[in-house]
């Protein structure tokens, strides 16, 4: 069906349906700006992880490891947020309001790759938080006993 044969009523419906609100456009622009920083945030997370792993490898005391662990957690969180923002930016502004459009867009390979990267960073952050970070040094100063799991 060519452009001359289209119904005027359907043309109006289609044009009006694809409009994006100002709030969705603003959220999209904010996510696009955050997504632009993803590579630098990921590099900061890698540097923080290397510093933390080095401190663990040399057997640094918990007082030295704890700030490095906090820095790693913050860097992983920032990189993860940027990855999810990149996913939303790849979907586009219409995805903020149209759940069907968003779901269809998530099936695209480019969006799927960004989702995988964001979830990988989320899993890495949670793994470190559950198993890899030392206890806060202030607990010793407060006289609070911290439960420790036996090491195998």
Predicted ranges, named:
Residues 37, 44, 71, 117-120:
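Charge-rich, solvent-exposed alpha-helical interaction surfaces
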Residues 71-91, 113-117:
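Amphipathic alpha-helical coiled-coil segments
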Residues 20-42, 54, 58:
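Short, charge/polar-rich alpha-helical segments
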Residues 58, 65, 78, 85, ...:
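Soluble, cytosolic/nucleoplasmic coiled-coil alpha-helices used as oligomeric scaffolds and tethers
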Residues 2-28:
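Short, charge-rich amphipathic alpha-helices with coiled-coil/heptad character
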Residues 93-152:
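Amphipathic alpha-helical binding modules
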Residues 62-73:
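Short, charged, amphipathic alpha-helical segments
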Residues 41-55, 75, 82:
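Non-transmembrane amphipathic alpha-helical segments
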């Amino acid at each position: 069906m060519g452009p001359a044969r289209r119904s005027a009523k359907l043309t109006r419906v289609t044009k009006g349906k694809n409009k994006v609100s100002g709030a969705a456009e603003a959220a999209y622009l904010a996510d696009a700006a955050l997504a632009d920083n993803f590579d630098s945030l990921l590099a900061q997370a890698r540097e923080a992880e290397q510093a933390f792993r080095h401190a663990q490898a040399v057997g640094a005391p918990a007082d030295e490891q704890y700030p490095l662990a906090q820095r790693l957690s913050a860097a992983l969180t920032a990189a993860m947020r940027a990855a999810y923002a990149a996913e939303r930016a790849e979907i586009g502004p219409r995805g903020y309001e149209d759940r069907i459009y968003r779901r269809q867009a998530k099936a695209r390979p480019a969006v799927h790759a960004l989702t995988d990267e964001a979830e990988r960073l989320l899993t890495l952050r949670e793994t470190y938080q559950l198993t890899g970070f030392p206890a806060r040094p202030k607990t010793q100063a407060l006289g609070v006993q911290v439960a420790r799991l036996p090491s195998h």
